[in-house]
């Protein structure tokens, strides 16, 4: 199971970046009141851009921990080191998405985050949308919700694929929009999903 990073780098990076990014990208946010102030919750968002994991924590008033593909933590060279340190500072946890037992380890990591009363950010599609459309989600989020009892807050991200298209390092300055929906609760036995 992956080790969950400490909150100090996250808090420091957030304090530094938030004023700059809020001023530059002027996020328009609806429904933020649906994110509980305490206790476990799952923020389930569409995934349009690398920058989704940066913009959402800017507006959510509590720490959001994401499950991120392990390749972000293992790239070689100076760029790889900077990328790894940035992802750790952003509160992201590396997970191997290759399937089987590795996928199980990712779910257990998510359950540990929720058991600690934290907020878990997840992209149900499992990867970025190549064209801005919403694709079929995977079942891991349902399992996390049913096994933890945590509410799922649906989140819609808009414009981030235009701000930072796949493969682009430098984002364009454009207004980002986010909408948080009402919490959803799921019950049942997650073993029935197989």
What spans do the regions from the language model cover?
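Catalytic-site beta-strand/loop segments enriched in glycine and acidic/polar residues
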Residues: 111-141
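A cross-family acyltransferase "interaction/gating" segment
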Residues: 35, 130-192
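Catalytic core of membrane glycerolipid acyltransferases/transacylases, capturing the structured
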Residues: 37-100
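Short, basic, glycine/proline-bearing loop/turn elements
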Residues: 16-18, 89-97, 124-127
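Short gly/ser/thr-rich secondary-structure transition/capping motifs
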Residues: 22-30, 102-104, 160-162
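Helix-adjacent hinge/juxtasegments
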Residues: 93-116
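A transmembrane-helix-recognition feature enriched in membrane-embedded lipid enzymes
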Residues: 1-30, 34-37, 62, 77-90
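Hydrophobic/aromatic ligand-binding patch that stacks against planar heteroaromatic rings
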Residues: 55-56, 86, 112, 143-147
């Amino acid at each position: 199971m992956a080790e969950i990073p400490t909150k100090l780098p996250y808090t420091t990076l957030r304090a530094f970046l938030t004023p700059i990014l809020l001023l530059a990208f002027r996020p328009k946010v609806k429904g933020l009141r649906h994110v509980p102030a305490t206790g476990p919750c799952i923020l389930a968002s569409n995934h349009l851009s690398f920058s989704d994991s940066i913009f959402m924590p800017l507006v959510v008033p509590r720490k959001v921990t994401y499950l991120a593909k392990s390749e972000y933590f293992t790239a070689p060279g100076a760029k790889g080191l900077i990328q790894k340190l940035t992802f750790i500072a952003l509160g992201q946890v590396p997970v191997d998405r290759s399937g089987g037992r590795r996928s199980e380890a990712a779910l257990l990591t998510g359950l540990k985050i929720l058991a600690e009363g934290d907020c878990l950010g997840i992209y149900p599609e499992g990867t970025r949308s190549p064209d801005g459309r919403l694709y079929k989600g995977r079942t891991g989020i349902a399992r996390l919700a049913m096994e933890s009892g945590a509410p799922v807050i649906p989140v819609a991200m808009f414009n981030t694929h235009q701000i930072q298209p796949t493969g682009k390092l430098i984002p364009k300055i454009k207004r980002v929009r986010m909408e948080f929906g009402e919490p959803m609760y799921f019950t049942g036995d997650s073993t029935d999903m197989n």
